[in-house]
Amino acid sequence: SFIGSLNDFRSYKAKLVGIPMDTDGMNMEALEKALETEKNVKFIYTIPNFQNPSGITMSLEKRHRLYELAKAHDVMILEDNPYGDLYYEGEPLPSIKSFDTDGIVIYAGSFSKVISPGMRVGYAIGPKPVLAKMTVCKQGQDVHTNIWSQVLCYRFMTEYDFDAHLAGLRKIYTKKR
């Protein structure tokens, strides 16, 4: 898991409960048990693609099961997907957010992994009230993201072939693995 996210959660006095990983993602039996026994669960944090530090990608079956468990227990999901565009082969699995019909998934992505690590620019998609609270949390960390980094990301996305750029990155990383 991303240490920055974990530290943000801790700053709000969150009780973090680790869930073991299987070869195809989070252990759903352990998650279900935690959801049944832990009190006041607010959300499930997951990195479904190339989970840090294991590198495991959650299977499609487990993505659907995670969503169903969250829905059944009235819990939101924070889907952190900084590495999702950097797959080596085949097609990427759909995000959990892509089948969210109930508005319970917050999707977070990053340009830091695909444009420049030093820029530290990310984004989130989710319910407006939750995004407003996330903005307050972000402001407590660094007031706001550097405006020039945001402008550079915007210009890169609008003036270059971003899909071709991602394909080039995948070729480079495939050779290095």
Regions inferred by a protein language model and the residue ranges of each:
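Substrate-binding/gating loop at the entrance of the active-site cleft, primarily
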Residues: 1-14
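Short, intrinsically disordered, charge-balanced linker/junction segments flanking boundaries
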Residues: 16, 169-177
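Active-site phosphate-binding strand-loop segment of PLP-dependent enzymes
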Residues: 24-88
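Conserved core segment of the aminotransferase class I/II
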Residues: 101-171
